[in-house]
Amino acid sequence: LATTKPTPLFPTYAELTELSLSDYPQLSAYLENQPKWMQQHWHWAKDYLLYIGRNKSEHTYVRFRNDIEKFLLWVFMVDKQPVDDLRKADILRYIDFCVAPPVRWISTQLHDRFNLSNGYFASNLNWTPFRQTPPKYDKDRVLDPKKYKPSLQTLESTFVALSSFYRHLIDEEICFGNPIPLAKRDCKHMIKDSQVKTISRLTEHQWQYLLDTAVELADTDALFERNLFIISTMKTLFLRLSELSERLDWSPVMSHFWTDEDNNWWFKVYGKGKKIRDITVPQSYLSYLKRYREWRGLSSLPSKGEQTVLVEKIRGRGGLTSRQISRLVQQVFDAAFDKMKSEKGLEAAQKLNEATTHYLRHTGASMEIERDRPLKDLSEDLGHSSSATTDTVYVQVERKRRASSGKDRKVE
């Protein structure tokens, strides 16, 4: 029944690669109590997620795991039809379910799926498939699961994951068709978005304020040297959060900073789509790199082959995860917001309250556009597939032309 509390089905990718159901007593008992076809479905989904984990990024695995898990729980507990029997109308009913899931399926906090207890992975009773989060600019908002409503982007992501799952089942000759594209075409919840896109960025003044705050924090407390290094690096080198973080198949190290025969500095990055690229490093950035390395007791600049972790944990070994880096960035955003609010008022500071880590990449790229850097060079630093992508996201020539042509029309 939809009112029954659902149980988690899949752990992290690292745990899934070594999964033995004997180590997951509640999950094992749950599956054993299901019909054979449901147990088979779980194994289909497990094989698919292992494929995603091997061939895609950790972020993609997490995103697809979340969507496939929700879908299977709906199949097991609500619809009770095998996935290879589902048609367009069934998928549309599932999307209706995702738009208004039962309250028992929604939580307002992030919970781990499984907790290690006495050598076993116990299913977390607090975990739910859906999570309601407050907007970043209103973190104190009291949430009501009855008012849960997924964003258009969330629904889009659901369709992408389900379509990928069905394509995998077709490749494995389990299914003979993919009902997802037809369902998406006819879904009443999918609204075509042709709105004018704005860039989520800081102004030059806001960026300088954020950087000055990070410097002040680091001058006062040396532990904030990491925060300063992270925000200056993400903005100046246009990095995505994942590109600075420790991943299963990549660990950023100091020797990823390197020089060519002309003494130009570069930074090697493992980016989106499992592509490695080199980013130009400006001279102005080197003082921040030197400051950070000096704090860590290293030589002023990296040497060839240096395997020192780029952003290391204070306790423990290895580099920081995306979530840990995000927390360090957020500390600086919060401090800058509080400072600007007290000095210039809430309205002036609001953008710093709304900003996320990705604002740093967008801010750096937008400021490069403003200084007339060649689009092709910037596009390669950003890791875009073409200059057209960079133009669409940052330059927005068509939007500016349209705004200009419509600006002088008359009312009378």
At which residue positions do the language-model features occur?
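N-terminal core-binding DNA-recognition domain of tyrosine recombinases/integrases
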Residues: 45-59, 69-197, 217
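Short pre-functional
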Residues: 163-167, 227-246, 266-267, 367
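Conserved tyrosine-mediated DNA breakage-rejoining catalytic core shared by Y-recombinases
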Residues: 246-291, 297
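C-terminal catalytic core of Y-nucleophile DNA break-rejoin enzymes
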Residues: 271-291, 306-332, 354
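Short, basic (Lys/Arg/His-rich) helix/loop patches that form interaction surfaces
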Residues: 326-380, 387
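DNA/chromatin major-groove-contacting recognition/catalytic segments
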Residues: 392-412
